Amino acid sequence: MAKRVLILATDGFEQSELLEPRKLLEAAGFETTLASPTPGTIRGWHDGDWGKPIKVDKDIEDVSADDFDALLLPGGQMNPDILRMDDRVIELIEDFDSENKPIGAICHAPWLLIEADIVDGRTVTGWPSIHTDLENAGAEVVDQAVAIDGNLITSRKPEDIPAFAQALIDALEEAEEEDEDDAEEEDDGIEEL
């Protein structure tokens, strides 16, 4: 069964930070689902103006970390700023983290990780204007394309998308291999009659 990635976004996401990683994840064989507290469609930000509407697959009320293998949080200034005020979003992020499932956050999306209180003592990156916020929340901030600390995969900006998406793909493939190894171990323990 293909690994499933939940994407959380609302109006004002950076269009490339949702569409490009989604395309790369799907090309690698993973299923994606876009959830939002905003029903119907949401609009991203593209080249200084509103982008095209994107269809929302599920309402945030209808998703659970139990149903997905990873979480993708696109940035943009408005999107994470709106989402971090929604307790349902923060609870979902906390659930992914407590289950040690990969969480990818790019650009301003690490604001959501701060709100979920999961960056203290961890190495992360993000858009330069939120570095102080991350440091004040106890994170060690690095200025590099991708920072990986346990299940957290963070990135700075749209130019980093290829490396960011690949890190998320690698984490999902590693989880698939672990699942296969666990299944083989269970099969080895079955006695034949």
Give the location of each predicted region.
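Extended, subdomain-level signal for the structured scaffold at the beginning of enzyme domains
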Residues: 1-99, 103, 112-118, 123, ...
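Catalytic nucleophile serine of serine hydrolases
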Residues: 107
